[in-house]
A protein has these predicted regions:
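Extra-cytoplasmic beta-strand recognition segments
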Residues: 9, 67, 130
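Substrate-binding cleft and catalytic face of glycoside hydrolase catalytic domains
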Residues: 80-243
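Short linear motifs at secondary-structure transitions and domain/linker junctions
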Residues: 3-7, 40-45, 58-64, 172-176, ...
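Solvent-exposed loop and beta-edge segments used for protein-protein assembly and interaction
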Residues: 20-22, 61, 126, 192
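Boundary/entry segment of secreted carbohydrate-active catalytic domains
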Residues: 14, 36-90
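Beta-strand-enriched, solvent-exposed domains that form extended recognition/catalytic surfaces
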Residues: 1-53
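Ser/Thr- (and often Asn-) enriched beta-sheet segments in non-cytosolic proteins
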Residues: 8-12, 79, 234
Length: 243
């Protein structure tokens, strides 16, 4: 059969406003006498890097020698010639007070001393040509239950939990955290530093490190995929060539 006539559409993303469409799904629909009828499956934006203010090239490691470290180990890293390193950034540690961040008309609060500690660590590394990878983790925090997938309970032998974007409140909070971190560590401020690589969750095939409780494999994978997409969109729409 012959294909239809090609068509293109333009619309504003309204980025940074309460009606932000950057994370929305879109469908093609036709107008019928009964209203609009969907004729395509929903699709998310797949190229958020096009709107990223930071279009700088990816910072590739200058060597394969790497180390996961803290600020107290910086001197050792320099002596060893380390050129890439990773840091853990956990939700339950970075939320608090002292830094207010507005996103889509809502204000979110981050711990000033904790964030400044990350600033010192990340900037010390990236300013010395060490490529930095951030590992994003979701620790249990009774003060922020919306960050945990509903139905998940705290376990003594579990270290971290699946990020929650399955509810509107969880989606909004997770999105704000992702956007804050992506903007904070985009390299524009040398006092904050530059994160070039992002790992969302840790050992996601291990229930102790990305716990969600009893569920099917397909539901677990879909939930992780949805959370990953939020971070991917936040990161790539800020720094186009981050990985």
């Amino acid at each position: 059969a012959n294909g239809g006539t090609p068509a293109s559409f333009n619309l504003s993303l309204n980025r940074g406003t309460a009606s932000d469409r950057l994370y929305s799904r879109f469908v093609v629909a036709v107008l019928t006498k009964d209203g609009y009828q969907e004729i395509s499956k929903p699709h998310y934006i797949t190229n958020p890097e096009l709107v990223a203010p930071n279009q700088n090239p990816y910072k590739a490691p200058l060597s394969k020698k790497g180390l996961q470290m803290e600020i107290s180990q910086i001197g050792d890293a320099f002596q060893l010639g380390v050129k890439h390193s990773s840091v853990n950034i956990a939700f339950h540690q970075i939320l608090g007070s002292g830094i207010d961040y507005e996103y889509d008309g809502k204000v979110y609060h981050f711990s000033k001393p904790v964030i400044e500690s990350y600033d010192a660590t990340i900037s010390a590394m990236s300013n010395k040509d060490i490529t930095v990878t951030a590992i994003i983790l979701n620790g249990w925090n009774p003060a922020t239950p919306d960050l945990i997938v509903p139905g998940t309970t705290q376990k003594s032998n579990v270290f971290y939990y699946m990020p929650n974007v399955t509810t509107q409140a969880g989606f909004e909070q997770t999105r704000a955290i992702a956007a804050f971190l992506a903007e904070r560590y985009d390299g524009s401020n040398p006092d904050y530093g530059k994160v070039s690589n992002w790992i969302i969750g840790n050992e996601i095939n291990n229930q102790q490190w990305n716990h969600m409780g009893a569920t099917s494999i397909s539901n677990y994978v879909q939930t992780y995929q949805d959370a990953f997409r939020v971070f991917y969109t936040a990161i790539k729409s800020t720094s186009a060539n981050d990985r």
